[in-house]
């Protein structure tokens, strides 16, 4: 059962209608696969979620209590290779007879979401309204971001790999670029697990096939990084958002232009390489879970508990800037004496109520309107949603001292 891309040997990308038919046929052909619609775009196209497990996919509740891997497949509509890699991997897992992979699927649910069908059809980075969905994971203004965040909230993945493409240039021309969450509010253990997956599993899998790999956002000369041009700690980007909600998340990017004369002469060769690299990165994430399933389940739960306790006691530090390897440089970018919560007016709460529900942020009514405590698993995210020091806050909240 080949994808249209495979049938063309890389000469033509799978179209969105073709993918809908392919997934329908895959669902019918394998008991391991379940395809569901988890949202609709403003042009009424389905946002489809593919679940794969053995002997059949677990229910949402059972999966959330166990082990889940989530792949977001080309949130930027003009970055085709992530979608193709996801279609192929879903098919391969559905029909695998490999004993180790079959055991893996008995214990872990693998999810694939095609989040931007409008951009897919239009061949645009953004959605139909021109919004970059990968800058919308805080405000959740788009149906595409809302669908992804709802999947994260309800299925509770242990790991996430966000598949993209990049335009190569001088000092920035490896087959794969990868990155972990860099936001400084991410739990340190979750940060380290995500970095381990990024470097020691996904990148390692790619390089084991003879491809090159580097860190996203870093220009490199003579083997040494000398300038950062992207890849910061913005919470509104998925790899950072994932870390803030206690998921070991990472970014995968493959070069979308020719890297040698052979690819320059043969677009189908270029396209196949793009897909192979993203597929290999995704396979690395699968291997991370195969080898560390129990550890990941334990540490995601422990991270949620650590955040809740820090929010209760007011210990730790809250950051509004910086990244994992760079501390803030200004007083208004950091809070060394954290608040215990935020006071919202009734009107503000009405404005953000649905958004908070999608983020899994809880609150309680009080005399001032609504109180959002930091004593919950989303402690690292909440100040970024409401504090005046947060560049991308979604509403105004008043910090409440402990």
Predicted regions and their residues:
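M14 metallocarboxypeptidase catalytic domain recognition
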Residues: 1-402
